[in-house]
From Swiss-Prot:
Transmembrane segments: none annotated. This is Phosphoribosylaminoimidazole-succinocarboxamide synthase. One of its GO terms (biological process) is 'de novo' IMP biosynthetic process. Coiled coil: none annotated. Belongs to the SAICAR synthetase family. Pfam families: SAICAR_synt. GO terms for molecular function: ATP binding; phosphoribosylaminoimidazolesuccinocarboxamide synthase activity. It catalyses: 5-amino-1-(5-phospho-D-ribosyl)imidazole-4-carboxylate + L-aspartate + ATP = (2S)-2-[5-amino-1-(5-phospho-beta-D-ribosyl)imidazole-4-carboxamido]succinate + ADP + phosphate + 2 H(+). SUPFAM superfamilies: SAICAR synthase-like (SSF56104). Keywords: ATP-binding, Ligase, Nucleotide-binding, Purine biosynthesis. Pathway: Purine metabolism; IMP biosynthesis via de novo pathway; 5-amino-1-(5-phospho-D-ribosyl)imidazole-4-carboxamide from 5-amino-1-(5-phospho-D-ribosyl)imidazole-4-carboxylate: step 1/2. It comes from Wolbachia sp. subsp. Brugia malayi (strain TRS).
Length: 240
């Protein structure tokens, strides 16, 4: 049973208050959504799988020198994380053409990009998370120029680490969505937030290009839980 002190509910997680004002609990739900919540389902066990995968990836990134909000795993569904002031942007880095990128630029799905492309999206469900450029980011004060450059540098480093991590598991990292924030006691420290799991990465089998991410649900391609379990297995993530 969840405690009463839920301070935020997202599509896939609850954020829960703790006695420490500098930390919160991130609770992984079994809900899965697509198309701005137009498609919805509860898949038993999805939250526990994502918790374990994200824990493994956050620990890998910390070892690589990336500052993340992750502190420790508390249970099969819960993580203790730093409390952040979330920056209202989603940063997407693309390595292979897929999804909306193909529609916007009339590019065939699966085309390998010559270099990683970074895109910014304004986090606003009511506006359907519109794509924005760097001038928008500066104009609305979401980031300073220096912070924007820092986030781009961090994003490329994360992408590089994860490309290698997944490649060693026989998986191509097609694209990746990241969120960042600032600790409430240090407004200058850009910190990786949220989760990294098949919910917010596109992951394809390197040889067959079989989808192993939320597109399985989005596009009705089969059993989402089986796909996520396959990712965990290939990464040697322990689920119990």
């Amino acid at each position: 049973m969840l405690p009463d002190k839920i301070i935020y509910e997202g599509k896939a997680k609850f954020i829960i208050e703790t006695k420490d004002p500098l930390t919160v609990i991130q609770y992984f739900k079994d809900e899965v959504t697509a198309f701005n919540k137009e498609k919805y389902k509860i898949i038993e066990g999805k939250g526990t799988i994502n918790n374990r995968i994200s824990t493994f990836i956050m620990e890998t990134l910390e070892k690589a020198g990336i500052n993340t909000h992750f502190i420790k795993t508390l249970s099969e569904r819960e993580q203790l994380v730093k409390k952040l002031k979330i920056i209202p942007l989603e940063i997407v880095v693309r390595n292979i053409a897929a999804g909306s990128f193909c529609k916007r630029f009339n590019i065939k799905e699966g085309e390998k990009l010559a270099f990683p492309i970074i895109e910014f999206f304004y986090k606003n469900d009511g506006l359907a998370d519109p794509m924005v450029n760097e001038n928008h980011v500066l104009y609305f004060g979401w980031l300073s120029y220096e912070e924007m450059e820092e986030i781009k540098t961090i994003t490329i480093k994360i992408n590089t680490v994860l490309i290698d991590l997944f490649l060693n598991a026989g998986i191509d990292l097609v694209d990746l969505k990241l969120e960042f924030g600032r600790p409430i006691n240090d407004n200058t420290k850009i910190t990786l937030a949220d989760e990294i799991s098949p919910d917010n990465c596109r992951l394809w089998d390197k040889n067959t290009h079989k989808k192993l991410d939320k597109d399985v649900f989005r596009l009705n391609l089969g059993n989402l839980k089986e796909a996520y379990l396959e990712v965990a297995k290939r990464l040697s993530v322990k689920l119990c």
